[in-house]
């Protein structure tokens, strides 16, 4: 039986989020609705999640000493990584010492903090189908990997980055140096290391939200949400929809792959498993041990959205992955480089039938920074996609003055 305390009292159940962007913000709201005391941590002040948490803390999360000091001072029951750029070896040390429980596990946080750990686990340890790949530490190694079998076209990504930063497609030899330079500029931390992948001519790509939670028997069970289709531009999601129609054999393969990788990572919580699909064939791409940006669509489509599923699972509560309605999401970009932007057209966006708008509250806007998302539901995904994109297009961030 799960027992929850009262926030801001000696009985409080305390959860610390490491990373407090738009996804963390929704997790924090879901936790607060269950009476959890929340601590939002980020590298900058007034991050979206910090605006709604009981406590806001700002540190360099990649600094092991700062991370250790904060966890020991706050004494949370659970630490929930929401980004990759964290001192994960320190989390492993603290978890091994019994200081804190890391979600889903400290090992999972370490393996998924960069593309190398999780790709080697999936392809080499678990034998899951993936694109051909090589890891490279220099421009010369990158060229040799391409010439040695990866071939063109191919995709180059920093081993650590998010939201498509530093990712590009190479169509021929003339693009190799530019791709290397772009990857070096776009990495989350200065690793100087990339993965180059052979290009898979897939029909579509999906995110399969996979939940490990305690079932009625008291044992950990794996549940799947309906597959989410999405469109990416330069590796960054711009729209998603649910459910993505799939051949039954492809869906079964996707679920087997997701089950295998999440079972190995262990722990409890929601995982975003990214997969490529062509006909009945499925290839593993990536996994995040936390809610996924493409999964924001579940705020319009599921009885329990991905953030509520994550919150419930990590607290040992029952989960329900049932689809409520077809729906879609479309990103609202900043469009301008400014602090404290204002948003015109929200009223017009909400006049689109069966839509909602979420503005993240980020203190600073960039041209390609996600500042919000439009959500829509309908009787079919095509109508929902049209509505979401129309609503998003009506919201116009602008600089003040």
From Swiss-Prot:
Its EC number is 6.3.1.21. GO terms for cellular component: cytosol. Residues 120-315 form the ATP-grasp domain. Mg(2+) binds at residues 274, 286. It catalyses: N(1)-(5-phospho-beta-D-ribosyl)glycinamide + formate + ATP = N(2)-formyl-N(1)-(5-phospho-beta-D-ribosyl)glycinamide + ADP + phosphate + H(+). N(1)-(5-phospho-beta-D-ribosyl)glycinamide binds at residues 22-23, 82, 293, 362, 369-370. GO terms for molecular function: ATP binding; magnesium ion binding; phosphoribosylglycinamide formyltransferase 2 activity; phosphoribosylglycinamide formyltransferase activity. InterPro entries: ATP-grasp, ATP-grasp_carboxylate-amine, ATP_grasp_subdomain_1, PreATP-grasp_dom_sf, PurT, PurT/PurK_preATP-grasp, PurT_C, Rudment_hybrid_motif. One of its GO terms (biological process) is 'de novo' IMP biosynthetic process. Homodimer. Involved in the de novo purine biosynthesis. Catalyzes the transfer of formate to 5-phospho-ribosyl-glycinamide (GAR), producing 5-phospho-ribosyl-N-formylglycinamide (FGAR). Formate is provided by PurU via hydrolysis of 10-formyl-tetrahydrofolate. This is Formate-dependent phosphoribosylglycinamide formyltransferase. The lineage of its organism: Bacteria, Pseudomonadati, Pseudomonadota, Betaproteobacteria, Burkholderiales.
């Amino acid at each position: 039986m799960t027992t929850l305390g009262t926030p801001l009292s000696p009985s409080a159940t305390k959860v610390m989020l490491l990373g407090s962007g738009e996804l963390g913000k929704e997790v924090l709201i879901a936790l607060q609705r269950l009476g959890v005391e929340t601590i939002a941590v980020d590298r900058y002040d007034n991050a979206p999640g910090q605006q709604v948490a009981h406590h806001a803390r700002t540190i360099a999360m990649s600094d092991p000493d700062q991370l250790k000091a904060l966890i020991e001072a706050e004494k949370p029951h659970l630490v929930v990584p929401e980004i990759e750029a964290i001192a994960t070896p320190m989390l492993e040390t603290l978890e091994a010492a019994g200081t804190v429980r890391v979600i889903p596990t400290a090992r999972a946080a370490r393996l998924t903090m960069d593309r190398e750990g999780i790709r080697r686990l999936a392809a080499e340890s678990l034998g899951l189908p993936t694109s051909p790949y090589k890891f490279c530490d220099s421009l010369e190694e990158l060229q040799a990997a391409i010439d040695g079998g990866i071939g063109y076209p191919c995709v180059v990504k920093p081993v650590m980055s998010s939201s498509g930063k530093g990712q590009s497609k190479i169509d021929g030899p003339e693009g190799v140096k530019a791709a290397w330079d772009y990857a070096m500029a776009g990495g989350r931390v200065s690793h100087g290391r990339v993965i180059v992948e052979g290009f898979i001519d897939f029909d579509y790509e999906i995110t399969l939200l996979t939940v490990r939670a305690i079932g009625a028997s008291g044992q950990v069970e794996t549940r799947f949400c309906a597959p989410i289709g999405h469109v990416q531009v330069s590796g960054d999601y711009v729209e998603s929809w649910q459910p993505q129609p799939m051949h039954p054999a492809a869906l079964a393969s996707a679920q087997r792959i997701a089950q295998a990788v999440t079972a190995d990572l262990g722990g409890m919580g929601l995982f975003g498993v990214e997969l490529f699909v062509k006909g009945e064939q499925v290839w593993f791409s990536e996994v995040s041990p936390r809610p996924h940006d493409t999964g924001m669509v579940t705020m319009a489509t599921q009885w329990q959205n991905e953030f509520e599923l994550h919150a419930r699972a990590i607290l040992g509560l029952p989960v329900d992955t049932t689809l409520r309605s077809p729906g879609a999401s479309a990103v609202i970009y900043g469009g301008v480089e400014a602090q404290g932007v204002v948003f015109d057209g929200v009223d017009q966006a909400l006049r689109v039938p069966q839509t909602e708008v979420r503005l993240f509250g980020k203190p600073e806007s960039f041209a390609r920074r996600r500042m919000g998302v439009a959500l829509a539901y309908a009787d079919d995904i095509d109508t929902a996609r049209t509505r979401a994109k129309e609503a998003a297009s009506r919201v116009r961030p602008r600089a003040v003055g």
